[in-house]
Amino acid sequence: MGGLMFILGIFVSILICGWKGMMAGDFEHLYIFFFALIFGGIGFLDDFEKVKHKQNLGLTAIQKFLLQLAAAVAFLCLMRFEGMLTPNLYVPFFNTQIVMSWWVYMVFAAFVIVGTVNAVNITDGIDGLAGSVTVPVGLFFTVLAIWWQGYEQLGIYAAALVGGILGFLIYNFHPAKV
């Protein structure tokens, strides 16, 4: 249930901060939000299967991996189709970029996305661990997005995520109350 509060908070911040851009036809922030919803839907499906079968086994590891990989590849293809993605890997703070072929970049980016999602998912079972690790990462993305020109709205979304996590962490440290 806590995830619903994160979703609501970020969606409200997208609507408030991104309204002007959406009126001008800029939907890139909604793409990111819907991508996150798809991954949340995979997690919900996994939990639903556990409840439905009244056992601790939801989706199999291969089912989860294939769904996550399909979602990551679909997202990357959408971002490329919309012209919001280049095969360049930017190294923050060093003003350096690594140029890759599209195929190498897509494999690398899909690996990073699926790996990150699973890393957070693994830590989510331990009281407060996922949130306490995600807060500094979210703060880093907030600062990075604001530092780079043109990405301020993504910084606001990252800050909204951090705020939601901090509010939830109060109840999620050991012993977790939710």
Where are these regions (language model features)?
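"…together with the soluble PPM/PP2C metallo-phosphatase catalytic core" -> "…together
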Residues: 1-178
